[in-house]
Amino acid sequence: DISENSTEHIPGSIVIPYTQFLNDTAVLSADELAALLGEAGISREDAVIVYGECMPCGGGPAPATFIYWILRSLGHDNVKVLDGMVEDWAAAGLPTSTDAGILPAKAFVPRVSSNFSAEYSYVESGQAQIVDARSIGEFATSSIPGAINIPYESVISGNRLRDESRLERIFGILDREQPVVVFTNTGLKASVVWYALELLGYDARLYSYENYWINQQTLNQEASLNSSE
């Protein structure tokens, strides 16, 4: 359960609020993440199901899909995202608990993969289709040149991912044979679209608009210095 301040859990759930995986908006280092997961009793060989939401962010599965992305990036293959929230679990007549699960510490040995995230050079290379998963309004204000707008809200209904046939229609504007880079400001909400693309078999990577602008500003500053010499 990666929700913050959650009081009801699926019985036996380990509680690690998703904010513990971050330092402000930046993801912790692989070693820091391995220590966090190991202390919680998770090894890379364990089967993991992630669920939860961020109510201050408006709810929805973005934090869960983001933690799923982090785990996959660390080489954890046996991980899934619960379809729905603990409320959906309870509504189905299944039990909940107010107690968090506690497991003995284990060694989480990361096997970091670069196949799940994009670098600025890759975004600029033209190799991938660029998907802006922010709102239509944000996209209209500014975006990465050439990006296609697929708002993250379009792939979910309430707290759940839309069905496969609907997702296929939404992603119909993309070339399935070409890689995809998905971004939002920090990448958190983009992870929902990235997750949906991965489920459908796309070669997708996650990116952040923050990183794009940091690199753009650096290049502009270098160009300005060169022109003044």
Residue ranges and their predicted role:
Residues D1-E229:
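Cytosolic catalytic domains that perform sulfur/thiol-centered chemistry
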